Amino acid sequence: MSKYQEMLDYVKWYQEKHKDENGKTPNPIFEIMVFEYPNKEMIYHKPEGDVPSGWPDTGCIDHMGFYYELDTAIQAMNENWCDIQETCYYAGFILCRFPGLYYAGTSRMYFLWDDEKKGFFEAEEPEIFKHVAY
């Protein structure tokens, strides 16, 4: 199953689980987050001595904004709307978010910058991120 379909299935599951007494469901946003270092050789932050914190060192991170439609967020990444790349960001996520603090669970899609196409395109998420929630 594609990450795209997984995200749509997650939205459907979440909305069904969180219907209110009137049948109203929460609506998601699709947040665009980008960062500097996409390579698989990233190191972990080591705040005290040599003990890894478990947080990958991605360099600068920026939350660029969000859209209410997944397809619009993907198009913004693919077409580098408003120069999301800013000459320094080479990877990013589209994160599915619902209202609230400390998200109970998220679904996300990983993207890498493509110099030839001048946009971000879906890629396999590196193992180093799979235990980190953003």
Identify the role of each PLM range.
Residues M1-S2, D20, K24, E127-Y134:
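Short intrinsically disordered terminal tails
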Residues L8-Q15, I74, N78:
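Residue-level detector of alpha-helical secondary structure
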Residues Y14, K19-D62, A91, L95, ...:
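Short aromatic-glycine-(Arg/Gly/Cys) micro-motifs in beta-strand/loop hairpins
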